[in-house]
Design a protein with these regions (language model features):
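Phosphate-binding site recognition
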Residues: 1-398
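Nucleic-acid nuclease catalytic cores
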Residues: 401-429
Length: 429
């Protein structure tokens, strides 16, 4: 039976049990576990499979999923080469996407709700006698859980997984920077929550894995958290997310797509979805996995190359997060966008932590374009990364960003992004 394309599927158990194709990334479980550091941060642009990978970790390490190990991982690398820590943790998972960031109050309510739901589910799943007291602060709820776990589960350890740690923070920073600063400042509620999580690493929290897009909140949060290691630019993990060319060909073969057809569609996919490199030493470029699955899902369903090569969800997602570029107020912002759209390479060191309390400079903005996926590493000059637009799709999206900047400067009327065929167009509202 031909396996289904997992477009939009981010739950690993669902993907395996409901016969979706899985590009095996489980060898990276072993690589992560073998690192000396136990607290890991991994940043990538949107739509590269980060949420699915956190689900892979969750199912692998969850002690309550031991009886499902063979079903879920039997055909994978890690199923044939299990590590000593498999199915040995209580998994506490948070996902901070979907929070209403209209104002500080709604943001904090949403953050507390996300934390409360995760903690309540965790307590019920692992049989912890614990009540989420909504009268407590968010950090108070976290502290109480850690204390209850320590008393009731002295033999167990917690693996904390935080997906999209910066999602709501990025939206705040792009649209309401003052709200952002208040929440992550020294006395901010979000900052205090991370401080309690840090305290937990001294007792019951053994491992942490965090995903996000940009290190925009790291400088604000981690002086209180001291997160271990950011492996974003570690060559060993360049291919942990997204697809390599060989992985993409394996997908095509699994769908019985003939070689003649592959020769027709692979150049199109390469031109539009390939081109990403996240560290200087990497040899292989990476395809955006979500864009590839969008294309293949339609190609298989309709038997022809899709008319629209750009997923409208991706286009709107990137244009929305691109609001963070407004942090750079200098005149060079527009010039940088124009240079990149014209295909000119830019040599620039990549900033590892942003400080949003001060105005972004040119280096910060170029680095932000790299983290958001607008630019990628294409080479080096005297040890400095050379950055260019990775593919045609991102070039179209960045042209939209350039137009938005012109609109802001010239005070024109509001416009919106429209996907038509293989192009992005600007339409007056």
């Amino acid at each position: 039976m031909r396996l289904k394309m997992p477009y939009g599927i981010s739950n690993f158990e669902e993907l395996i049990t409901e016969n979706y194709y899985y590009v095996d990334k489980t060898m990276y479980i072993e690589k992560l576990e073998n690192l000396p550091e136990k607290r890991i941060m991994f940043l990538h642009p949107r739509k590269f499979g980060k949420t699915l990978f956190t689900s892979v970790l969750e199912n692998y390490y969850d002690k309550e999923k031991a009886d499902k190990f063979e079903t879920l991982y039997g055909k994978t690398y890690i199923g044939k080469n299990p590590t000593k820590l498999k199915n040995s943790y209580c998994i506490l998972r948070f996902n901070f996407s979907g929070i209403n960031t209209e104002n500080e109050e709604s943001t904090m309510i949403g953050f507390k709700e996300k934390v409360s739901i995760s903690i309540d589910g965790f307590a019920k799943k692992y049989g912890i006698d614990f009540f989420v007291n909504q009268e407590q602060t968010t950090e108070g709820i976290m502290r109480s859980l850690i204390e209850a776990f320590k008393l009731q589960k002295p033999e167990d350890k917690i693996y904390v997984i935080i997906d999209e740690y910066d999602h709501f923070a990025n939206e705040l920073l792009g649209f309401y920077p003052e709200h952002f600063r208040n929440l992550v400042s020294k006395n901010g509620r979000v900052r205090k929550w991370y401080e309690i999580l840090k305290e937990g690493t001294e007792t019951v929290v053994d491992r942490i894995f965090i995903t996000g897009v940009a290190p925009i909140t790291l400088d604000s949060l981690t002086s209180g958290f001291n997160i271990g290691t950011d492996i974003t630019q570690d060559v060993r993990f360049n291919e942990m997310m997204g697809f390599t060319k060989n992985e993409l060909i394996e997908i095509l073969n699994s769908q019985d797509i003939l070689k003649e057809e592959q020769e027709q569609i692979l150049p199109i996919m390469k031109e539009n979805y390939d081109g990403y490199k996240f560290c200087l030493e990497a040899k292989n470029q990476i395809y955006n996995s979500n864009m590839c699955l969008y294309f293949l899902n339609r190609y298989i369903e309709f038997g022809k190359i899709p008319t629209k090569l750009i997923d409208v969800n991706i286009a709107s997602d990137y244009s929305k997060i691109g609001k963070m570029l407004d942090l750079c107020k200098g005149e060079n912002r527009l010039e940088i966008l124009r240079k990149t759209v014209q295909g000119e390479p830019i040599n620039n060191n990549i900033v590892e932590k942003f400080n949003p309390t001060i105005e972004f400079n040119e280096t910060d903005m170029i680095s932000m374009l790299y983290y958001l996926g607008y630019l990628t590493i294409s080479g080096e000059d005297l040890g400095m990364p050379e950055l260019t637009i990775p593919n045609k799709v991102m070039k179209q999206i960045e042209r939209y960003s350039e137009f938005e900047d012109i609109k802001d400067i010239e005070g024109l009327r509001k416009y919106t992004i429209v996907v038509a065929g293989n192009e992005l167009y600007i339409e007056e509202i």
